[in-house]
A protein has these predicted regions:
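Short, structured loop/turn "capping" segments at alpha-beta junctions
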Residues: 110-113, 145, 170-172, 199
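Conserved Class I SAM-dependent methyltransferase catalytic core
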Residues: 3, 129-185
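Conserved SAM/SAH cofactor-binding pocket of Class I
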Residues: 12-97, 101-104, 110-118
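Conserved SAM-binding loop and adjacent beta-strand
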Residues: 1-16
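SAM/dcSAM-binding transferase cores
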Residues: 182-228
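Mobile active-site "lid"/loop adjacent to the S-adenosyl-L-methionine
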Residues: 106-133, 137
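Residue-level signal for inorganic ion chemistry
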Residues: 10, 105, 134, 192
Length: 228
């Protein structure tokens, strides 16, 4: 299975809900349902299934090849009974239930950066899932008390934050990701909800000066990498 750093970070970093309200009843994180939008190979869904041992995770993916790969990965995992792959467009998805947590590693290239590879464009380009529509759909699908977690490149993250605030979202947590201490931040991990809160501000360093993984990075991913 292809493993990307963005997905690894989001799957390990996102805060799991302690409880949400479904039909007037409090539901704990271990019995709630989570949604992975644009799941790709299914990495984030698998990580969430490991972290929340009884939660149900649904992954929705538009690309047929990626959906088949995710479905294969789900079947091969020990969490298969709690993972479901949905092939389709999130914008037309109308489930009966609402989700305690929605995660997404969304497309992020601007129009000017479109290439000739249609599948690559779809996977990594904002035209396939405009961020305003992602926010609107997440608001529709979240249970009361639920949250949206995602990862974006640093420049896009700032614009997204302004957009989210204008649409009535509140930042729960934000984490700037640095490849090295002497470099500008590459990514920002963010988690948002629909009620006011005091946001946590964090920073994460991936590599030490000698190129080895930082202790902070190892600690975050130690439950997923045997070598850590």
């Amino acid at each position: 299975m292809k493993v990307g750093t963005d997905g690894l970070l989001l799957g390990a970093w996102a805060s799991l809900p302690t409880y949400v309200s479904l039909n007037g009843c409090a539901v704990t994180k271990d019995s709630a349902a989570y949604l992975d939008i644009g799941s790709g190979s299914g990495l984030i869904s698998l990580m969430l299934a490991q972290r929340a041992p009884q939660a149900t995770i649904r992954a929705i993916e538009l690309d047929s090849d990626a959906a088949r790969q995710a479905e294969h990965n789900f079947r091969q995992s020990s969490f298969a009974s709690r993972l479901q792959l949905l092939k389709g467009d999130i914008l037309t998805y109308q489930p009966a239930e609402r989700y305690a947590l929605i995660v997404s590693n969304p497309p992020f290239f601007d129009n000017a950066l479109l290439g000739s590879n249609g599948k690559r464009n779809q996977a990594r380009h904002t035209a396939s899932l405009p961020l305003p529509l992602l926010l609107a759909k997440a608001a529709e699908l979240l249970a009361p008390g639920g949250s949206l977690a995602l990862v974006l490149p640093e420049p896009a993250a700032e614009a997204f934050s302004q957009l989210a605030g204008a649409q009535g979202w509140f930042a729960m947590a934000s984490c700037q990701v640095f490849s090295r201490a002497d470099k500008a931040p590459l990514r920002r991990l963010m988690q948002w909800q629909r009620v006011p809160c005091q946001p946590r501000q964090q920073q994460l360093l991936i590599h030490n000066d000698d190129g080895s993984y930082s202790e902070q990075y190892r600690h975050l991913l130690r439950d997923f990498y045997l070598k850590f």
